[in-house]
Amino acid sequence: GVVSEAADGESIQLSIDLRLQHVQHRELLRAMRETGASAASAVTLDAMTGEILAMTNLPSFNPNRRGQLDLAAMRNRVVTDVFEPGSTVKPLTLVAALESGEFDIETLIDTSPGRIMVGNKVLPDPRNYGEITVSRVIEKSSQVGVTKMAQAIGHEHIIVVFQRFGLGQLTGTEFPGERAGRLPDHDFWSAIDRVTPAFGYGLLVTPLQLAHAYAVFANEGRMVPLTLLAQAFQEIDHSASGARQIISPMVAEKVVTVLHRVTGPAGTAQRATVSGFDVGGKTGTVHKVGREGYLDDRYVALFAGVAPVESPRYVTVVVIDEPEGDVYGGGAAAAPVYSRITQEVLRIQNVVPNSAEPVSNDRRLAASREGDSRA
């Protein structure tokens, strides 16, 4: 007899958008050709729903040619490869500073004379920025300014904020081989150990973790669980989906304001701009580590951004591994890739431009060369 009537399973659909996947693949290939990089990755999220819209890694492989498979090319670098995030983590340090009550984005910090001694280490800026606001500290990616903020609020508070944003933890996607990264946990914190996490050294993250963290800024301070399944409903029930309010909407709004300024004429990410839209983000350039310490001539170039600024929803992280020559900084190697990917993200998602006459990146760059694209 029949124990129970059969029930049809539910239909599922992946959140991956093949059009965006193609765009990422095309633009990463272009970036590798132009920079001579050894590898590249990108991931795009919908911050409101937690959907992973595209995720690309190069070098790639053809699964139909099994005799030519390169195991290194089969890695899903977005979830398996970890790196020091460098200056892309400074917006999280900004969160710690704002929550401390000691700083606002217009608080002044004296960065003179353009360098600061911490223990026996000298941390320099590209030049002496003098007395600048906290916002300008992030715009210029001032090591001196961020160091003074870190010393004022304490490394404990910064690490707690990193933990709230999911750094050092698995994202919950259950991707095979996903790594949790690492946060510093010293038995003894030297003077330099207390400040380096604030500007992204001494910790390890994956591109997906970094994108998930930036999604908090794009979603009014809420962290939504990531998913590879397309969300069936336009109205997302955040309480039911496991979303958590990890920072206040006001703090998130202030951080987005600063991220937008980073792409402005005085910031390090002028080449991240997108015609017809206001975007925000942060550059990062980190030295790679060899057997005997940091390497002087090998870098990872990073950019993490949100768009559009007036109603942020889409987050993209770009990682360019070992770019060669003079085009090795996050602002020069990774930011233009973000710009081209995000242009297509917003077009495909039918986001209406806010400018009737879009200003091209080249015209905007010609207007000002004040920013340092290497930060």
Predicted regions located by residue number:
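Conserved, well-ordered alpha-helix/loop/beta-strand core segments that scaffold catalytic motifs
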Residues: 1-40
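Beta-lactam-recognizing serine transpeptidase/beta-lactamase-like catalytic domain environment
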Residues: 1-3, 7, 16, 42-87, ...
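Short beta-strands and strand-coil junctions in structured, solvent-facing domains, enriched
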Residues: 22, 30, 324-326, 347-348
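A helicase ATPase "motif cassette" and its flanking acidic/Ser/Thr-rich regulatory loops
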Residues: 24, 137, 338
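Surface-exposed helix-capping loop/turn segments at secondary-structure junctions
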Residues: 33-38, 268, 348-354
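Short, gly/Ser/Thr-rich active-site loops of penicillin-recognizing serine hydrolases
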Residues: 234-243, 332-375
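A short acidic/glycine-rich loop-to-helix N-cap element
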Residues: 322-332
